[in-house]
Amino acid sequence: AAVALARQAYRLSPAEAALLLALLGGQTPQDFADARGVRIRTVRAQMSALLFKTRTQRQQDLVALVARLMLVAPQNDFRD
């Protein structure tokens, strides 16, 4: 629910939302690139877009922002 809320609030693309979910799950950008079969350059571009859209500057800030959203999102499932 938190990722779905972030996706709607910040107009994230499906790829950006998937990256966000992976980061929340503890994956690194390289892990995500390997799992998706894409280049790290692609993931870095998606990360840059995520940071820009959420007005955060670092991956840690992004994860903290979504963690705060988890406090207000419905508690049924954070894996949307």
Label every PLM stretch briefly.
Residues 26-61:
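Recognition helix of helix-turn-helix DNA-binding domains
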Residues 48-80:
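Basic, Lys/Arg-enriched C-terminal extension of HTH/homeodomain DNA-binding domains
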Residues 1-14:
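Regulatory hinge/linker segments at domain boundaries
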Residues 11, 32, 67:
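Residue-level marker of positions within ordered structural domains that often coincide
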Residues 23-27, 66:
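Short helix-to-turn junction characteristic of helix-turn-helix DNA-binding domains
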Residues 8, 21, 51:
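Generic anion/oxyanion-binding catalytic loop in active/binding sites
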Residues 5-7, 37-39, 79:
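Short, charged/polar low-complexity linear motifs in solvent-exposed/disordered segments
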Residues 15-19:
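The N-cap/first-turn positions of alpha helices
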